[in-house]
């Protein structure tokens, strides 16, 4: 087997092992589901996003909020995954072994990220289904949604590498990642954001993704 075949096997192995491990310990998925739905419930109760009806001339503004929320979940998953993976490897003393491995580090961590995306997709589907029943949101899936979400995820993964480096340097991984995830919720038009802030955050992948997703929806 050639080198490319070996790298693919290692990539697939990382995906499979992390996915099965996460499924086996379901508490993390269940807690994520509860937190995501609870936070979305807050936005629905406070009627966040009603300004989108005028901005996009679209009556079903709750769908636009849900779209932004889905994009945000993928974005924070990218950041938390790479930061968490690096922190875990450092804690267990295995990072330097992976750095010196014959396989590129991006393949090893990339497999973990793909597994994370698959798990988050399951969680997102459940959140969307529950939201449709509880809040009566008319949500329609468009295949075109996949392109901006994919590009956003890759962009946010790159940002996640930078964030992880900073967080590990200051030894405050959890705190820094949490603050950035929270900030992204309110400065990227995931929920209505002022034009002044959007002028600054316009080029963040999540902000662009939210804009494109809503344009597709309407």
What are the roles of these predicted feature ranges?
Residues 1-34:
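Aromatic- and glycine-rich beta-strand/loop motifs that create alpha-glucan
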Residues 21-89:
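Transmembrane helix-boundary elements of multi-pass transport/secretion proteins
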Residues 105, 110-175:
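Alpha-helical transmembrane segments and their short interhelical loops
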């Amino acid at each position: 087997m050639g080198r490319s075949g070996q790298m693919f096997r290692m990539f697939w192995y990382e995906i499979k092992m992390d996915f099965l491990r996460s499924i086996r310990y379901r508490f993390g998925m269940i807690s994520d589901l509860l937190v995501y739905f609870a936070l979305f419930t807050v936005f629905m109760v406070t009627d966040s996003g009603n300004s989108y009806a005028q901005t996009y001339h679209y009556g079903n503004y709750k769908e636009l909020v849900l779209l932004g929320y889905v994009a945000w979940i993928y974005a924070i998953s990218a950041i938390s995954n790479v930061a968490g993976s690096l922190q875990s490897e450092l804690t267990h003393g295995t990072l330097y072994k992976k750095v010196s491995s014959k396989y590129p580090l991006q393949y090893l961590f990339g497999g973990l990220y793909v597994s994370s995306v698959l798990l988050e997709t399951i969680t997102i589907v459940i959140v969307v289904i529950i939201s449709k029943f509880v809040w009566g949101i008319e949500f329609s899936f468009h295949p075109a949604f996949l392109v901006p979400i994919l590009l956003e995820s890759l962009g946010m993964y790159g940002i996640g590498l930078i964030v992880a480096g900073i967080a590990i340097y200051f030894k405050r991984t959890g705190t820094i990642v949490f603050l950035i995830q929270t900030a992204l919720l309110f400065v990227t038009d995931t929920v209505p954001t002022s034009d002044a802030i959007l002028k600054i955050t316009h080029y963040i992948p999540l902000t662009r993704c939210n804009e494109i997703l809503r344009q597709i929806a309407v």
